[in-house]
């Protein structure tokens, strides 16, 4: 699926590298990136999407992403960054159409409208279609941006903390939707989450970055979610046991770093 080989990057040549010779493989399906603040999770998604100049190589299904032009790349990959939930005079329909059309003055086909309607319905926000984006709640805006990201039918989807601004029930519903979307559309997703329990419940593959931008571990949840990982990566003390589905359950006791 996605292979990162010898990736090095720094925002400033006079500063220490965020990544230095980082190599990691992602799997097909639902991938989650975990790690503390400052580990470089968002930077990694930007590098994959081609927003940063880096050293090394990133391959998706054997294609070197640094060797293809940006227009070709955005046909292959959709990216939802963390963003300010800004004010826009556009309706939800128009906002999501922007995911398919670079500019709204282009001819809008029946197929475009159908695609937007279907993705809004799949996300259970079709009732928002005629509303103005600026009048929506933070959680509703987040879902509209997600619809805009998914409506192009990309092969690889990068999501930077899409569960922010959502309550727990909405987070669960969103992750379940993404899991179903992967199976239905045969796409791959890499998502940054802060909630380890969400990652355990839904991820096919987990990549854990430490706070120095290094790969700590990667693999299935039962392999990488350990008491040692909680201590060394997150600085918390806790118990990890396996449930009936052989998935880890975490019980955090206290923060080691708060001593």
Ranges and model annotations:
Residues 157-161:
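Catalytic Walker B motif of ABC-type/P-loop ATPase nucleotide-binding domains
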Residues 54-65:
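Conserved ABC transporter NBD signature motif
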Residues 1-4, 8-22, 27, 67-69, ...:
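A short, flexible loop at the N-terminus of ABC-type nucleotide-binding domains that lies
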Residues 49:
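Helix-to-loop junction immediately C-terminal to a conserved catalytic motif
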Residues 110-128, 145, 153:
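Conserved ABC ATPase "signature" region
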Residues 223, 227, 231-259:
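ABC ATPase nucleotide-binding domains
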Residues 132-136, 140:
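Conserved ABC ATPase signature
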């Amino acid at each position: 699926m996605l292979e990162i080989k010898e990736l090095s990057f720094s925002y400033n040549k006079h500063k220490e590298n965020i990544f230095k010779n980082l190599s990691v493989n992602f799997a097909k399906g639902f991938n989650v990136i975990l790690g503390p603040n400052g580990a470089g999770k968002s930077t990694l998604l930007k590098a994959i999407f081609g927003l940063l100049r880096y050293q090394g190589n990133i391959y998706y299904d054997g294609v070197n992403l640094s060797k293809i032009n940006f227009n070709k790349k955005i046909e292959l990959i959709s990216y939802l960054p963390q963003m300010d939930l800004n004010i826009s005079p556009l309706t939800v329909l128009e906002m999501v159409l922007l995911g398919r059309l670079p500019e709204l003055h282009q001819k809008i086909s029946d197929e475009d409208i159908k695609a937007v309607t279907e993705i809004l319905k799949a996300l259970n926000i079709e009732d928002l279609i005629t509303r103005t984006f600026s009048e929506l709640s933070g959680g509703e805006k987040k879902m509209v941006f997600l619809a805009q990201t998914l409506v192009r039918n990309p092969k690889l989807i990068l999501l930077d903390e899409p569960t922010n601004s959502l309550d727990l029930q909405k987070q669960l519903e969103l992750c379940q939707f993404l899991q179903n979307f992967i199976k239905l559309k045969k796409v791959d997703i890499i998502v940054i989450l802060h909630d380890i329990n969400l990652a355990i419940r839904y991820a096919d593959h987990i990549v854990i970055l430490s706070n120095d931008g290094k790969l700590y571990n990667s693999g299935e949840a039962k392999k990488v979610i350990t008491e040692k990982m909680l201590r060394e990566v997150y600085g918390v003390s806790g118990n990890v046991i396996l449930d009936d589905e052989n998935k880890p359950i975490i019980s955090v006791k206290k923060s080691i770093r708060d001593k």
